[in-house]
Amino acid sequence: MFGWEFPPFNSGGLGVACEGLSKALASSGVDLTFVLPFKIPISVPWCRFVFSNESTDLISENQMQRLFSGYQSHSIHSKSSKTQDNGLPDAVSGDLIERVRAYALRAGAIAKKNKHSVIHAHDWLTYPAGIEAKKVSGRPLVVHIHATEFDRSGDNINKEIYNIELEGFRKADMVVAVSGRTREKVIQKYGISPHKVKVVHNGVEFQKSVNPVLETFNRIKAGGNKIVLYA
């Protein structure tokens, strides 16, 4: 499984979803290896981690040019570049496309060294890595779409990210969308066959999540504040 972040080292919901899915798969008996683009001090009992920046086996420059020849060459920068309190670079700062590219360069070697039956890649950040892993092992590729570029940017999309998403959808054996609405966007905006796109909703761990949330709500209400719940 190729991810981009994992709690507590996450900047949004993607890492939380990856944590929940990996834990659920492991509880069903799946032997899971979770790959991240950079090393972080993390360990969980249900899966093992592989950090791509520890791999020294890279593909050649010619292979790199072939891999990204279909994409634009400009860089994507965030509005601000910052470092987390733990000293790790923010996952969304700096040249994001270069980070995605570097991740993909090492994915083939990781796939070669780690036995697996299926490849699972989360969002566009990991699709090139998943594609390279599939080229090496020939195993089925499942790409998970948590949010499309249209969800993030409306109609003012970044074409480079769109092209990476499109390539991932086309080369995947299955596309997993987090909702029916996301599935429809993949079908309509990217021209992907409806038979290829399945819906798997995000789950909730009630025992883990509800009590702390209720306690937080009670503290907010005790302070005289109003609560608006969006569902």
Residue ranges, per PLM feature:
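Conserved donor-binding/catalytic core segment of Leloir-type glycosyltransferases
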Residues: 176, 219-231
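Carbohydrate-associated surface elements
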Residues: 38, 181, 203
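A conserved catalytic-core segment of Leloir-type glycosyltransferases
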Residues: 24, 28-114
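Active-site proximal beta-strand in glycosyltransferases
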Residues: 118-120, 127, 131-152, 176
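Acidic anion/phosphate-binding donor-loop and adjacent secondary structure
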Residues: 153-156, 187-188, 195-196, 204-219
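A short, active-site helix/loop in glycosyltransferases that binds the activated sugar's phosphate group
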Residues: 162, 168-196, 206
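A short, glycine/small-residue-rich beta-strand->loop->alpha-helix junction that serves as a flexible
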Residues: 5-19, 42
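Nucleotide-sugar donor phosphate/pyrophosphate-binding loop at the beta->alpha transition
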Residues: 99-106, 139-142, 150-167
